[in-house]
Regions:
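C-terminal cap/loop subdomain of S1 sulfatases and analogous C-terminal strand-loop tails that border
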Residues: 3-83, 87, 119-124
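Residues within well-ordered alpha-helical secondary structure of globular protein domains
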Residues: 13, 33, 100, 110-114
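A generic structural signal for ordered secondary structure
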Residues: 84-86, 98, 109
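Active-site-proximal N-terminal segment of extracellular/periplasmic enzymes that hydrolyze or transfer
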Residues: 95-103
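Charge-dense polyanion-binding interfaces
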Residues: 107-129
Length: 129
């Protein structure tokens, strides 16, 4: 698991520059193929909302709003309840396992809130201009 933000710390190491960035992780060996071990988790943001990836699991907190942005026919990830997906078995995120896997959901919520805080649902409404 890697993220484009990890390029900052990784390229900095490559050119021997010291940078201080709490979001970026130095994963140069992963990017150049010397290692397959990247991040264990990642907070993901889209449309002003955040979700949490940990290993094969994706947790999307409840957010208000329409599940589909009709003007452009884009799925927004909004739901009244938590969503939990095993991406190894369900890459399309069709089978919400939140009710079937309450311990896993609780673990991901806890780890997400350690990074993001518990005010994650205070988001702006997306506006097309």
């Amino acid at each position: 698991l890697v993220c484009q933000i990890d390029l900052l710390e990784s390229i900095a190491k490559l050119v021997n520059v010291d940078v201080k960035n709490t979001d970026s992780q130095e994963l140069l060996d992963v990017f150049i193929g010397k290692s397959a071990k990247g991040r264990t988790s990642l907070v993901i943001e889209a449309n002003t909302k955040t979700a949490f990836r940990q290993g094969d699991w994706m947790m999307i907190p409840p957010y208000p709003g329409d599940s589909i942005l009709e003007e452009v026919n884009i799925e927004m990830g909004n739901d009244k309840e938590f969503q939990l997906y095993n991406l190894k078995k369900d890459i399309g995120q069709k089978n919400n396992l939140a009710k079937a896997q309450p311990k896993k959901l609780k673990e991901l919520i806890k780890n997400f809130e350690l990074i993001r805080g518990d005010n994650y649902n205070n988001v702006e409404k997306i506006e097309l201009k």
